[in-house]
């Protein structure tokens, strides 16, 4: 897979969905292929903190999680092991990621524990993950900090280093993003530049 873009909004057709489309346009304009995965379209159960992943040292991949074969969380995780470029887009809900997105992030706990037994994916080459965050609030000193911190350590599960996020304030109702030509241009440029850098390696 060339590039995978995860869109984390619960709302279909909102601004972070639009950001995902713009990133894809940027990647394609640079000669890459991009797939957008909408997290809301997948069934993801909550981590139960059952401890199964701590003791199931003879299991790998999705079998390391007690819920791994009962929902679609692993289906979303898989591209993160192979994609050459990774992007996340998300709105901000109460200074953090939306609940469905955060539920998926929480389900990656088994990957942290799997590192202790050196599953094959742990030696993946380091890659970069890029993020676009949009918030309805026009102000807030730490408006993006919760989402950024969670994504930083989530990405590390897959040997992905989170680049400085592209963030936008005062983007709330559908169409707000497109109302700012400079915003849409910056997102498209991010997609194009990110893929161009990957393609040169």
Identify the role of each PLM range.
Residues 163-170:
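Beta-strand-loop-alpha "switch" segments that mediate conformational coupling across diverse proteins
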Residues 100, 116-163:
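Short, glycine-/small-residue-rich phosphate/pyrophosphate-handling segment
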Residues 80, 86-87, 153, 157, ...:
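Intrinsic disorder/low-structure terminal segments
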Residues 1-90, 95-113, 173-201:
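N-terminal beta1-alpha1-beta2 submodule of the flavodoxin-like/Rossmannoid cofactor-binding fold
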Residues 21, 34, 41, 119-123, ...:
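Residue-level signal for alpha-helical context at structural boundaries
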